[in-house]
Regions:
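Conserved thiamine diphosphate
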Residues: 1-47
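Glycine-rich beta-alpha junction loops
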Residues: 45-52, 137-139, 190, 214
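Redox- and metal-dependent alpha/beta enzyme cores, enriched for Fe-S-associated oxidoreductases
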Residues: 120-156, 160, 166-172
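Short acidic, glycine/serine/threonine-rich loops at helix termini
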Residues: 25-28, 52-59, 196-198, 220-222
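Conformationally flexible catalytic loops at phosphate/diphosphate-handling active centers
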Residues: 38-123
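Short, solvent-exposed amphipathic alpha-helical segments in soluble enzyme
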Residues: 28-33, 58-61, 145-154, 174-178, ...
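Peripheral docking tails and interdomain loops at the edges
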Residues: 187-233
């Protein structure tokens, strides 16, 4: 449901904030990307981030496009002013299979363009890491503290935080599969992103999952223990 909101072979841009600041920033970014690619974008926030209180710096307000700018910049828009051009018909329904296939091929080309240009992720202490914690949202913040505790014990751990869950940072994770001994995917679920990580790693290193369910937020020590028991042992 993150990559695509349902059936139909389509994909959604999914942004995963890890702070209240990013919650605010990603609203503007989500609209910007949705407008740029004419593609739905979703902000995949978790309950922990949603209940946090932090200082936020809001961006300067941008002026709205004038009607003339909309017509110039958005030739696809249904503005109600079709003088001088053919009407824009906006629909996902094509009754002819041949026409529908052409549409779908065009969409797939757009998705490849998004995958090439819009992958976002954060790396923390990955330069010398022997083990990697892969996490998004609030779990990435908890994982960062777990990384610090692990390094105090002499375990070289880095964090890779996907910011876009689609497009997913597949190439970045695949590159680390040649450098680290194992990866622990930490999530507030029974295991969802781990499948994407395993596909990226392609069996090169061990990939295991640690998660808590039902709204329970784990302690950083639990992640360190999971790393030691599932990956390092």
């Amino acid at each position: 449901t993150v990559k695509g909101g349902g059936h139909g072979d389509y994909k959604l841009i999914a942004l995963a904030p890890a702070s209240v600041q990013e919650m605010a920033d990603f609203v503007a970014l989500g609209f910007e990307l949705a407008f740029k690619y004419r593609n739905p974008a979703i902000i995949l926030a978790d309950g922990v981030i949603g209940q946090m209180m932090e200082k936020v710096v809001l961006p300067a307000q941008k002026p709205r496009r004038t009607d003339a700018e909309v017509i110039e910049q958005c030739p696809w828009a249904a503005t109600g002013k079709a003088k001088g051009r053919k009407p824009n018909i906006i629909t996902s329904l094509e009754l002819k299979p041949e026409a529908m296939e052409i549409n779908n091929i065009r969409f797939q080309a757009k998705y490849k363009q998004i995958e090439e240009n819009e992958v976002r992720f954060e790396e923390i202490n990955c330069e010398d890491a022997e083990y990697l914690i892969v996490a998004f949202g609030s779990m990435a913040r908890i994982g960062q503290k777990a990384m610090e505790l692990a390094r105090e014990k002499g375990i070289k751990v880095g964090i890779l935080r996907p910011i876009t869950l689609w497009p997913f940072p597949t190439k970045a994770i695949a590159a680390y599969a040649d450098k680290v001994k194992g990866m622990l995917v930490t999530e507030l679920n029974a295991g969802q992103m781990i499948e994407d990580v395993r596909l990226a790693v392609n069996g090169k290193v061990k990939v295991e999952h640690f998660g808590r369910l039902g709204g329970i937020v784990p302690d950083p020590d639990e992640i360190v223990t999971a790393l030691e028991e599932k990956i390092i042992k």
